[in-house]
Design a protein with these regions (language model features):
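Conserved SGNH/GDSL esterase-like catalytic core that processes O-acyl groups on lipids
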Residues: 2, 16-120, 196
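Active-site metal-binding loops of divalent metal-dependent hydrolases
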Residues: 8-9, 98
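Short hydrophobic segments within beta-strands
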Residues: 6-7, 141
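Alpha-helical cap/lid subdomain in secreted, periplasmic
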Residues: 74-220
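Short glycine/proline- and aromatic-enriched beta-strand/turn motifs that initiate or cap beta-hairpins
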Residues: 3, 9-10
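Residue-level detector of flexible, active-site-proximal loop/helix-junction positions
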Residues: 10, 61-64, 145, 186
Length: 220
């Protein structure tokens, strides 16, 4: 089973993302976060738990779903990186939305092609993934809270996150994809700066995604 990841900085790791992508978890930051190897990242923990292998990690630090740039998750350029030259993924994990929330991206577009609104671009992203990878199972994760003790410049308001999560839930349902519910007022992940998970934080994210995927598989 081959996995591809559509993510932002939380899902990056030096040496595992496409050439010229911005990466948050450089060797120095990985050490700061307590990540001993790529196997301590949330996404590799998920892949390993299902006995799978990585196809592509299409994660770009600082990227939004919305926006008219090649780094935007809904762009043709980003979506095209979900497959490799040799293979296609069986599963695509979409873990996007934190930067849109933090950046205050407009929630609802004026029309279906609005590249600057979260709801329209999340839908465009899923349309393009499904068109390119019609056989892949697509899982979309809502934005998870950080631990109550987390602090730093990236701390988000709970009520604000939920506005974006509501869009993720609805658009995921409308496009026939599987939802992984990550939002729980009583569960958060630990960080190094208020947003980016440390080793324990990566484990917490992985646990939520693994549980969500298993629930979805049982209901299929």
């Amino acid at each position: 089973m081959k996995f591809s990841i559509m993510g932002d900085s939380i899902s990056t790791y030096e040496g595992y993302n496409p050439f010229l992508y911005d990466v948050f978890y450089t060797e120095e930051r990985a050490i700061q976060a307590g990540l001993r190897s790529v196997n301590d990242t949330w996404w590799m923990k998920v892949i390993n738990s299902f006995g799978g292998e990585l196809c592509m990690n299409d994660s770009y630090s600082g990227s939004y779903v919305a926006g008219a740039t090649s780094a935007s998750a809904h762009s043709v350029e980003r979506v095209s990186k979900l497959k490799s030259e040799e293979s296609l993924p069986d599963i695509v994990l979409v873990c996007m939305g934190a930067n849109d929330c933090g950046g205050g991206i407009t929630l609802h577009g004026e029309d279906a092609d609005d590249e600057y609104a979260f709801d329209t671009t999340y839908g465009i992203m899923l349309d393009r993934i499904k068109a390119m990878l019609p056989e892949a199972k697509i899982y979309c994760a809502t934005v998870m809270l950080t631990d109550d003790e987390a602090s730093g410049k990236y701390k988000f308001r709970l009520d604000y996150i939920e506005k974006y999560n509501e869009i993720i839930r609805q658009v995921t349902k409308d496009h026939g994809c599987a939802l992984i519910e990550m939002f729980d007022k009583h569960i958060g992940y630990t960080t190094i700066d208020g947003l980016h998970p440390d080793r324990a934080g990566h484990q917490a994210i992985a646990d939520m995604i693994i549980a969500g995927m298993k629930r979805s598989m049982l209901s299929d």
